[in-house]
Structure formats: C-alpha cells, structure tokens
C-alpha cells in the first residue's frame, strides 16, 4: 500500500474520522465502519489531510490549474489543497460555490477565480449518490470551465443495489468520462486493518461487508 494511503487511514483513525463498530447508513445497510471527514477539524489535521490528497492526485497525474470545492464540505478541502500545492511551489487557482444565490455585493453563486477556460479538479470528501459532484459539473460547464478530474478522500467501493452492481464512483465515471481518484479505498482499509494487530477484530466484519456489498471490479 502506498505511504500516503497508510498515512491517511492512520490520520483518519487518530482523528476519529474513521470508526469501527455497527453503523446504520442512509441506505439502511449496517456497516462495520463509518467515515466522517468533519472530524478533520483542526488546522494540523486539515493540513495533513491536504498532503494526502495532493500525493494521491500527483500519483494519478491529473491535469488541472484550478481547484473547485462544492459547498459545503468541499470548500475547506479545496482551500487546504490549494495551500498545500502553494507549499509545493505550485500556485493553483481556487473557486467554490455557495448554495444560496447572493443578490448584493459581488452577487451570484461563485466565489474565487473565474472558471472560463480553466482545467478544473473537483474535490470532495466522498461520493455517495454523486448529487453534489453532478451539480458541480453543471456549474463548471455553464461557466465555461472544463472538469478534468475528481478527488475524494475515501472510495467505499460499494454497489448501489443488488440489481445495480456498479458503485457510485463507477457510475459517475461511466456517465461523465471524468477520472476519479481517491486517497484510499475499502480495499486499502481492509489491508490496513489486516496489518494492524490492534484492529484485527474488525477484519472479518469488514471482509464480510465487502464480499456482500463490494463492487466486483476495482474503481
């Protein structure tokens, strides 16, 4: 497993962004783990998370000159990622949207650099149904930008339903043709748990969950 994947999973565990147990998901499934990026809630944690994002994005050789953060969770992620790239001496443009239209001041729904003519990376924490990402794609294209990649923290690699064996990530890539990179996947989480003696008791429930709900192809 790549070092940045291990760093991310350990950071998530230490930050309580990654928890093990029994969790009822919005889908009604009982999951043996839960991921909540809201627990990266300090400057140090967010900076460390941004390093992991940048490492994953660089490993995927994504081509972009602007980072777009969908409201709301994508906003601090995009800002932190742009700061991390500045630290690496690459100055990227930054834009995010607001969900409510502002009718005074600068107005509109976009804050930051103009999107027109830009190659744009969208960043978010996870892709569940893909609604926020699809809205971001619509906003970007309407503003004259070109979405060239999507980055998320964790890819759950989970089928949509028993009759639809694609994950939300696979469905989004098939629909849009835009590559999605994740810092880590459920497969990485399984390997991480297997290699950590203190987490050994969670391996079998995770494996059973992946066997039942996991996608057949890697994504």
Swiss-Prot record:
HAMAP family per the UniProt record, alphabetical: PyrE
UniProt record similarity statement: Belongs to the purine/pyrimidine phosphoribosyltransferase family. PyrE subfamily.
Superkingdom in the source lineage: Bacteria
InterPro entries linked: OPRT, Or_phspho_trans_dom, PRibTrfase_dom, PRTase-like
Matching Pfam families: Pribosyltran
Cofactor: Mg(2+)
Protein name listed in UniProt: Orotate phosphoribosyltransferase
GO BP term, example: 'de novo' UMP biosynthetic process
Origin species: Xylella fastidiosa (strain M12)
């Amino acid at each position: 497993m790549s070092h940045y994947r291990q760093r991310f999973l350990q950071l998530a565990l230490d930050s309580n962004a990654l928890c093990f147990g029994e969790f009822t998901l919005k889908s009604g499934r009982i999951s043996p783990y839960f991921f909540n990026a809201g627990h990266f809630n300090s400057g140090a944690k967010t900076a460390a998370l941004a390093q992991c994002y940048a490492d994953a994005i660089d490993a995927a050789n994504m081509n972009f000159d602007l980072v777009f953060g969908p409201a709301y969770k994508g906003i601090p992620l995009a800002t932190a990622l742009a700061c991390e790239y500045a630290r690496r001496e690459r100055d990227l443009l930054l834009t995010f949207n607001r969900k409510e239209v502002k009718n005074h001041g600068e107005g509109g729904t976009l804050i930051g650099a103009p999107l027109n003519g830009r190659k744009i990376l969208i960043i978010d924490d996870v892709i569940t149904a893909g609604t926020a990402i699809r809205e971001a794609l619509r906003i970007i294209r309407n503003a004259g930008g070109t979405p060239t990649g999507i980055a998320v923290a964790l890819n759950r690699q989970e089928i949509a339903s028993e009759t639809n064996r694609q994950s939300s990530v696979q469905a989004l890539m098939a629909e849009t043709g835009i590559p999605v990179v994740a810092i880590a996947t459920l497969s990485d989480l399984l390997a991480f748990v297997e290699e950590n003696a203190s987490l050994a008791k969670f391996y079998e429930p995770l494996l059973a969950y992946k066997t039942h709900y996991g996608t057949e192809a890697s994504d």
